[in-house]
Amino acid sequence: MADKVNVCIVGSGNWGSAIAKIVGANAAALPEFEERVTMFVYEELIDGKKLTEIINETHENVKYLKGHKLPPNVVAVPDLVEAAKNADILIFVVPHQFIPNFCKQLLGKIKPNAIAISLIKGFDKAEGGGIDLISHIITRHLKIPCAVLMGANLANEVAEGNFCETTIGCTDKKYGKVLRDLFQANHFRVVVVDDADAVEVCGALKNIVACGAGFVDGLKLGDNTKAAVIRLGLMEMIRFVDVFYPGSKLSTFFESCGVADLITTCYGGRNRRVSEAFVTSGKTIEELEKEMLNGQKLQGPPTAEEVNYMLKNKGLEDKFPLFTAIHKICTNQLKPNDLIDCIRNHPEHMDTSIMPSPKLQNL
Protein backbone atom coordinates (compact mmCIF):
# COMPACT_ATOMS: atom_id res chain seq x y z
CA MET A 1 0.00 0.00 0.00
CA ALA A 2 1.17 3.56 -0.74
CA ASP A 3 3.06 5.70 1.80
CA LYS A 4 0.02 7.98 1.94
CA VAL A 5 -3.17 5.99 1.54
CA ASN A 6 -5.69 7.50 -0.89
CA VAL A 7 -9.35 6.89 -0.07
CA CYS A 8 -12.40 6.96 -2.33
CA ILE A 9 -16.01 6.63 -1.17
CA VAL A 10 -18.15 5.10 -3.91
CA GLY A 11 -21.59 6.42 -3.07
CA SER A 12 -23.09 9.48 -1.42
CA GLY A 13 -26.51 8.53 -0.12
CA ASN A 14 -27.61 8.79 3.49
CA TRP A 15 -25.13 6.17 4.80
CA GLY A 16 -22.33 7.11 2.41
CA SER A 17 -22.52 10.75 3.48
CA ALA A 18 -22.64 9.83 7.18
CA ILE A 19 -19.56 7.64 6.87
CA ALA A 20 -17.83 10.41 4.86
CA LYS A 21 -17.92 12.56 8.01
CA ILE A 22 -15.83 9.99 9.90
CA VAL A 23 -13.55 8.95 7.04
CA GLY A 24 -12.90 12.56 6.01
CA ALA A 25 -12.03 13.60 9.56
CA ASN A 26 -9.68 10.63 10.03
CA ALA A 27 -7.97 11.16 6.66
CA ALA A 28 -7.29 14.78 7.61
CA ALA A 29 -6.02 13.89 11.09
CA LEU A 30 -3.95 10.74 10.57
CA PRO A 31 -0.53 10.92 8.84
CA GLU A 32 -0.87 7.58 7.02
CA PHE A 33 -3.77 8.85 4.89
CA GLU A 34 -3.84 11.34 2.04
CA GLU A 35 -5.95 14.26 3.26
CA ARG A 36 -8.14 14.56 0.15
CA VAL A 37 -10.95 12.00 0.07
CA THR A 38 -12.91 11.64 -3.16
CA MET A 39 -16.60 10.77 -3.02
CA PHE A 40 -18.40 9.56 -6.13
CA VAL A 41 -21.73 11.38 -6.38
CA TYR A 42 -24.40 10.46 -8.89
CA GLU A 43 -25.10 13.82 -10.49
CA GLU A 44 -28.54 15.26 -9.83
CA LEU A 45 -30.05 18.71 -10.12
CA ILE A 46 -31.31 20.24 -6.88
CA ASP A 47 -33.28 23.44 -7.53
CA GLY A 48 -31.45 23.78 -10.85
CA LYS A 49 -27.95 23.33 -9.39
CA LYS A 50 -25.66 20.28 -9.62
CA LEU A 51 -25.50 18.26 -6.42
CA THR A 52 -21.69 17.92 -6.69
CA GLU A 53 -21.34 21.71 -6.84
CA ILE A 54 -23.59 22.14 -3.81
CA ILE A 55 -21.56 19.58 -1.82
CA ASN A 56 -18.20 21.08 -2.79
CA GLU A 57 -19.32 24.66 -2.10
CA THR A 58 -21.41 24.17 1.05
CA HIS A 59 -19.93 20.85 2.32
CA GLU A 60 -23.43 19.49 2.79
CA ASN A 61 -25.32 16.75 0.96
CA VAL A 62 -28.63 18.61 0.96
CA LYS A 63 -30.53 15.72 -0.61
CA TYR A 64 -29.43 12.72 1.46
CA LEU A 65 -27.96 14.13 4.70
CA LYS A 66 -29.46 17.57 5.16
CA GLY A 67 -28.26 19.57 8.13
CA HIS A 68 -24.88 17.84 8.51
CA LYS A 69 -21.60 19.35 7.37
CA LEU A 70 -19.06 17.12 5.62
CA PRO A 71 -15.35 17.73 6.22
CA PRO A 72 -13.98 20.17 3.60
CA ASN A 73 -11.40 17.59 2.45
CA VAL A 74 -14.21 15.33 1.14
CA VAL A 75 -14.52 16.20 -2.54
CA ALA A 76 -17.60 15.26 -4.57
CA VAL A 77 -16.76 13.86 -8.02
CA PRO A 78 -19.49 13.02 -10.59
CA ASP A 79 -17.32 10.61 -12.63
CA LEU A 80 -16.86 7.17 -11.05
CA VAL A 81 -13.52 6.33 -12.70
CA GLU A 82 -12.11 9.79 -11.99
CA ALA A 83 -13.07 9.48 -8.32
CA ALA A 84 -11.59 5.98 -7.93
CA LYS A 85 -8.49 5.90 -10.16
CA ASN A 86 -5.92 6.88 -7.50
CA ALA A 87 -7.55 5.13 -4.55
CA ASP A 88 -5.74 2.62 -2.37
CA ILE A 89 -8.96 1.98 -0.43
CA LEU A 90 -12.34 1.91 -2.17
CA ILE A 91 -15.34 2.19 0.16
CA PHE A 92 -18.44 0.84 -1.59
CA VAL A 93 -21.68 2.23 -0.17
CA VAL A 94 -24.32 2.17 -2.91
CA PRO A 95 -27.49 0.11 -3.44
CA HIS A 96 -26.35 -3.44 -4.15
CA GLN A 97 -27.98 -3.59 -7.58
CA PHE A 98 -25.47 -1.02 -8.92
CA ILE A 99 -22.37 -3.02 -7.99
CA PRO A 100 -21.99 -5.24 -11.12
CA ASN A 101 -22.21 -2.21 -13.42
CA PHE A 102 -19.86 -0.12 -11.28
CA CYS A 103 -17.32 -2.96 -11.25
CA LYS A 104 -17.46 -3.14 -15.05
CA GLN A 105 -16.70 0.57 -15.25
CA LEU A 106 -13.81 0.29 -12.80
CA LEU A 107 -12.19 -2.84 -14.23
CA GLY A 108 -8.64 -2.00 -15.32
CA LYS A 109 -9.05 1.64 -14.18
CA ILE A 110 -8.02 1.28 -10.53
CA LYS A 111 -4.73 0.51 -8.81
CA PRO A 112 -4.00 -3.24 -9.00
CA ASN A 113 -2.97 -3.33 -5.33
CA ALA A 114 -6.02 -1.42 -4.07
CA ILE A 115 -8.33 -2.96 -1.48
CA ALA A 116 -12.07 -2.55 -1.09
CA ILE A 117 -14.53 -2.55 1.78
CA SER A 118 -18.27 -2.96 1.32
CA LEU A 119 -20.76 -1.20 3.58
CA ILE A 120 -23.65 -2.59 1.53
CA LYS A 121 -26.33 -4.54 3.39
CA GLY A 122 -27.85 -6.78 0.78
CA PHE A 123 -27.22 -9.58 -1.69
CA ASP A 124 -27.17 -9.71 -5.44
CA LYS A 125 -28.86 -12.48 -7.39
CA ALA A 126 -26.52 -15.32 -8.23
CA GLU A 127 -26.62 -16.71 -11.74
CA GLY A 128 -29.37 -19.30 -11.81
CA GLY A 129 -30.89 -17.96 -8.57
CA GLY A 130 -29.87 -17.65 -4.96
CA ILE A 131 -27.55 -15.08 -3.40
CA ASP A 132 -24.16 -13.67 -4.27
CA LEU A 133 -22.32 -11.73 -1.57
CA ILE A 134 -21.43 -8.19 -2.61
CA SER A 135 -17.84 -8.55 -1.36
CA HIS A 136 -17.46 -11.67 -3.51
CA ILE A 137 -18.75 -9.81 -6.59
CA ILE A 138 -16.28 -6.97 -6.02
CA THR A 139 -13.35 -9.36 -5.56
CA ARG A 140 -14.36 -11.48 -8.55
CA HIS A 141 -14.76 -8.52 -10.92
CA LEU A 142 -11.96 -6.23 -9.76
CA LYS A 143 -9.46 -8.91 -8.61
CA ILE A 144 -8.85 -7.10 -5.32
CA PRO A 145 -9.58 -8.18 -1.71
CA CYS A 146 -12.80 -6.85 -0.22
CA ALA A 147 -13.58 -6.55 3.49
CA VAL A 148 -17.02 -5.68 4.90
CA LEU A 149 -18.35 -3.27 7.53
CA MET A 150 -21.72 -3.98 9.14
CA GLY A 151 -23.34 -3.01 12.41
CA ALA A 152 -26.11 -1.27 14.32
CA ASN A 153 -25.44 1.95 12.46
CA LEU A 154 -28.50 4.00 11.55
CA ALA A 155 -27.02 6.69 9.32
CA ASN A 156 -28.63 9.75 10.88
CA GLU A 157 -27.53 8.71 14.38
CA VAL A 158 -23.96 8.13 13.18
CA ALA A 159 -24.03 11.56 11.53
CA GLU A 160 -25.25 13.10 14.81
CA GLY A 161 -22.22 11.65 16.58
CA ASN A 162 -24.23 9.36 18.85
CA PHE A 163 -22.20 6.48 20.29
CA CYS A 164 -22.38 3.17 18.43
CA GLU A 165 -20.33 0.11 17.49
CA THR A 166 -19.60 -1.53 14.18
CA THR A 167 -17.96 -4.72 12.93
CA ILE A 168 -15.37 -5.05 10.18
CA GLY A 169 -15.02 -8.50 8.67
CA CYS A 170 -11.55 -8.85 7.16
CA THR A 171 -9.54 -12.01 6.59
CA ASP A 172 -6.18 -10.19 6.36
CA LYS A 173 -4.95 -8.74 9.68
CA LYS A 174 -2.70 -6.20 7.97
CA TYR A 175 -5.61 -4.66 6.06
CA GLY A 176 -7.84 -4.96 9.12
CA LYS A 177 -5.63 -2.56 11.09
CA VAL A 178 -5.59 0.07 8.33
CA LEU A 179 -9.36 -0.14 7.94
CA ARG A 180 -9.89 0.11 11.68
CA ASP A 181 -7.79 3.29 11.76
CA LEU A 182 -9.80 4.75 8.89
CA PHE A 183 -13.22 4.16 10.47
CA GLN A 184 -12.61 4.33 14.23
CA ALA A 185 -13.86 7.44 16.04
CA ASN A 186 -14.71 8.38 19.62
CA HIS A 187 -18.38 7.76 18.90
CA PHE A 188 -17.91 4.99 16.30
CA ARG A 189 -16.10 2.02 17.83
CA VAL A 190 -14.79 -0.70 15.54
CA VAL A 191 -14.22 -4.40 16.22
CA VAL A 192 -12.37 -6.37 13.52
CA VAL A 193 -13.13 -10.08 13.08
CA ASP A 194 -11.92 -12.53 10.44
CA ASP A 195 -15.36 -14.11 9.88
CA ALA A 196 -16.12 -11.85 6.91
CA ASP A 197 -18.85 -13.88 5.20
CA ALA A 198 -20.89 -14.23 8.39
CA VAL A 199 -20.57 -10.48 9.05
CA GLU A 200 -21.90 -9.72 5.59
CA VAL A 201 -24.70 -12.28 5.67
CA CYS A 202 -25.92 -10.85 9.00
CA GLY A 203 -26.14 -7.42 7.39
CA ALA A 204 -28.54 -8.73 4.76
CA LEU A 205 -30.63 -11.28 6.67
CA LYS A 206 -31.60 -8.85 9.42
CA ASN A 207 -33.56 -6.86 6.82
CA ILE A 208 -35.87 -9.86 6.36
CA VAL A 209 -36.48 -10.08 10.10
CA ALA A 210 -37.12 -6.31 10.23
CA CYS A 211 -39.97 -6.79 7.76
CA GLY A 212 -41.48 -9.30 10.19
CA ALA A 213 -41.08 -6.80 13.05
CA GLY A 214 -42.83 -4.18 10.92
CA PHE A 215 -45.74 -6.53 10.24
CA VAL A 216 -46.07 -7.10 14.00
CA ASP A 217 -46.09 -3.34 14.61
CA GLY A 218 -48.68 -2.81 11.88
CA LEU A 219 -50.88 -5.50 13.38
CA LYS A 220 -50.41 -3.94 16.85
CA LEU A 221 -49.49 -7.29 18.39
CA GLY A 222 -47.25 -5.77 21.06
CA ASP A 223 -43.71 -5.98 22.34
CA ASN A 224 -43.78 -9.61 23.47
CA THR A 225 -44.68 -10.79 19.98
CA LYS A 226 -42.10 -8.50 18.41
CA ALA A 227 -39.41 -9.83 20.76
CA ALA A 228 -40.35 -13.40 19.80
CA VAL A 229 -40.07 -12.56 16.09
CA ILE A 230 -36.66 -10.95 16.65
CA ARG A 231 -35.38 -13.96 18.63
CA LEU A 232 -36.67 -16.48 16.10
CA GLY A 233 -35.18 -14.31 13.37
CA LEU A 234 -31.77 -14.47 15.05
CA MET A 235 -32.02 -18.25 15.30
CA GLU A 236 -32.88 -18.51 11.61
CA MET A 237 -29.96 -16.22 10.74
CA ILE A 238 -27.59 -18.49 12.67
CA ARG A 239 -29.11 -21.58 11.08
CA PHE A 240 -28.89 -20.10 7.56
CA VAL A 241 -25.20 -19.22 7.93
CA ASP A 242 -24.51 -22.69 9.32
CA VAL A 243 -26.16 -24.34 6.29
CA PHE A 244 -24.86 -22.10 3.50
CA TYR A 245 -21.59 -20.69 4.94
CA PRO A 246 -20.28 -23.50 7.18
CA GLY A 247 -17.35 -22.79 9.45
CA SER A 248 -18.59 -19.41 10.68
CA LYS A 249 -18.31 -18.55 14.37
CA LEU A 250 -21.23 -18.22 16.76
CA SER A 251 -19.41 -15.33 18.45
CA THR A 252 -19.82 -13.23 15.28
CA PHE A 253 -23.58 -13.08 15.87
CA PHE A 254 -22.95 -11.32 19.19
CA GLU A 255 -20.93 -8.54 17.55
CA SER A 256 -22.57 -5.33 16.37
CA CYS A 257 -23.16 -6.87 12.93
CA GLY A 258 -25.37 -9.55 14.48
CA VAL A 259 -27.76 -9.14 17.38
CA ALA A 260 -27.18 -5.37 17.78
CA ASP A 261 -27.89 -4.58 14.11
CA LEU A 262 -30.90 -6.88 14.20
CA ILE A 263 -32.40 -5.04 17.18
CA THR A 264 -31.83 -1.53 15.86
CA THR A 265 -33.18 -2.42 12.41
CA CYS A 266 -36.29 -4.03 13.91
CA TYR A 267 -37.00 -0.84 15.85
CA GLY A 268 -35.66 1.98 13.69
CA GLY A 269 -34.92 0.91 10.11
CA ARG A 270 -36.74 1.61 6.86
CA ASN A 271 -37.60 -2.06 6.28
CA ARG A 272 -39.57 -2.01 9.53
CA ARG A 273 -41.26 1.32 8.74
CA VAL A 274 -42.37 0.34 5.25
CA SER A 275 -43.54 -3.09 6.42
CA GLU A 276 -45.68 -1.49 9.12
CA ALA A 277 -47.19 0.83 6.51
CA PHE A 278 -47.77 -2.19 4.24
CA VAL A 279 -50.11 -3.58 6.91
CA THR A 280 -51.85 -0.34 7.85
CA SER A 281 -52.22 1.30 4.41
CA GLY A 282 -53.09 -1.60 2.14
CA LYS A 283 -50.63 -0.22 -0.44
CA THR A 284 -48.03 -2.33 -2.23
CA ILE A 285 -44.38 -2.46 -1.19
CA GLU A 286 -43.45 -0.72 -4.46
CA GLU A 287 -45.89 2.16 -3.86
CA LEU A 288 -44.65 2.66 -0.31
CA GLU A 289 -41.01 2.60 -1.44
CA LYS A 290 -41.70 5.53 -3.77
CA GLU A 291 -43.69 7.44 -1.15
CA MET A 292 -41.50 6.92 1.91
CA LEU A 293 -37.87 6.40 0.89
CA ASN A 294 -36.79 9.48 -1.07
CA GLY A 295 -35.31 7.39 -3.89
CA GLN A 296 -33.76 4.75 -1.63
CA LYS A 297 -34.52 1.05 -2.10
CA LEU A 298 -35.91 -1.48 0.35
CA GLN A 299 -33.59 -4.47 0.88
CA GLY A 300 -35.78 -6.83 2.92
CA PRO A 301 -38.29 -8.13 0.32
CA PRO A 302 -35.77 -8.87 -2.48
CA THR A 303 -33.41 -10.51 0.02
CA ALA A 304 -36.30 -12.63 1.32
CA GLU A 305 -37.03 -13.72 -2.26
CA GLU A 306 -33.48 -14.88 -2.94
CA VAL A 307 -33.18 -16.58 0.44
CA ASN A 308 -36.46 -18.38 -0.23
CA TYR A 309 -35.09 -19.62 -3.56
CA MET A 310 -32.10 -21.14 -1.75
CA LEU A 311 -34.22 -22.71 0.97
CA LYS A 312 -36.66 -24.17 -1.55
CA ASN A 313 -33.78 -25.67 -3.54
CA LYS A 314 -32.61 -27.54 -0.44
CA GLY A 315 -36.11 -28.42 0.77
CA LEU A 316 -35.59 -26.33 3.91
CA GLU A 317 -38.55 -23.94 3.89
CA ASP A 318 -40.14 -25.71 6.86
CA LYS A 319 -36.92 -25.25 8.89
CA PHE A 320 -37.11 -21.48 8.30
CA PRO A 321 -40.80 -20.68 8.83
CA LEU A 322 -40.22 -17.01 9.69
CA PHE A 323 -38.12 -16.25 6.58
CA THR A 324 -40.61 -18.23 4.48
CA ALA A 325 -43.68 -16.45 5.88
CA ILE A 326 -42.14 -13.00 5.44
CA HIS A 327 -41.35 -13.76 1.80
CA LYS A 328 -44.89 -14.99 1.19
CA ILE A 329 -46.42 -11.91 2.84
CA CYS A 330 -44.23 -9.57 0.77
CA THR A 331 -45.38 -11.36 -2.41
CA ASN A 332 -49.07 -11.48 -1.37
CA GLN A 333 -49.15 -15.27 -1.04
CA LEU A 334 -50.09 -14.80 2.62
CA LYS A 335 -51.73 -11.98 4.56
CA PRO A 336 -49.77 -10.21 7.32
CA ASN A 337 -52.07 -11.63 10.00
CA ASP A 338 -51.03 -15.15 8.92
CA LEU A 339 -47.52 -14.50 10.27
CA ILE A 340 -48.05 -15.76 13.81
CA ASP A 341 -49.75 -19.00 12.72
CA CYS A 342 -46.69 -19.69 10.55
CA ILE A 343 -44.28 -19.46 13.49
CA ARG A 344 -46.48 -20.87 16.26
CA ASN A 345 -44.88 -24.31 15.86
CA HIS A 346 -41.40 -23.09 14.95
CA PRO A 347 -38.71 -25.83 14.95
CA GLU A 348 -36.95 -23.78 17.61
CA HIS A 349 -39.85 -24.57 19.95
CA MET A 350 -39.68 -28.27 19.15
CA ASP A 351 -36.02 -29.07 18.51
CA THR A 352 -33.30 -27.97 20.90
CA SER A 353 -30.61 -29.04 18.42
CA ILE A 354 -31.47 -26.40 15.78
CA MET A 355 -28.27 -24.55 16.73
CA PRO A 356 -25.39 -27.02 16.32
CA SER A 357 -23.48 -27.36 19.58
CA PRO A 358 -19.93 -27.35 18.09
CA LYS A 359 -20.27 -23.61 17.47
CA LEU A 360 -20.45 -23.00 21.20
CA GLN A 361 -16.71 -23.67 21.34
CA ASN A 362 -16.21 -20.44 19.44
CA LEU A 363 -17.78 -18.18 22.05
Curated annotation (Swiss-Prot):
The gene is Gpdh1. It comes from Drosophila melanogaster (Fruit fly). Belongs to the NAD-dependent glycerol-3-phosphate dehydrogenase family. It is found in: Cytoplasm. The active site is at K206. Homodimer. Substrate binds at K121, R270, N271. Changing N337K: In allele GPDH-AT198, allele GPDH-ACB62 and allele GPDH-S. Isoform GPDH-1 is predominant in thorax and isoform GPDH-3 in abdomen. One of its GO terms (molecular function) is NAD binding. Changing N14Y: In allele GPDH-ACYG22. GO terms for cellular component: cytoplasm; cytosol; M band; Z disc. Pathway: Phospholipid metabolism; alpha-glycerophosphate cycle. It catalyses: sn-glycerol 3-phosphate + NAD(+) = dihydroxyacetone phosphate + NADH + H(+). It comes from the Eukaryota. Its EC number is 1.1.1.8. GO terms for biological process: ethanol metabolic process; flight behavior; glycerol-3-phosphate biosynthetic process; glycerol-3-phosphate catabolic process; glycerol-3-phosphate metabolic process; glycerol-3-phosphate shuttle; glycerophospholipid metabolic process; glycolytic process. Its main location: cytoplasm. NAD(+) binds at G11, S12, G13, N14, W15, G16, F98, K121, A155, R270, Q299. This is Glycerol-3-phosphate dehydrogenase [NAD(+)], cytoplasmic. Keywords: Cytoplasm, NAD, Oxidoreductase.
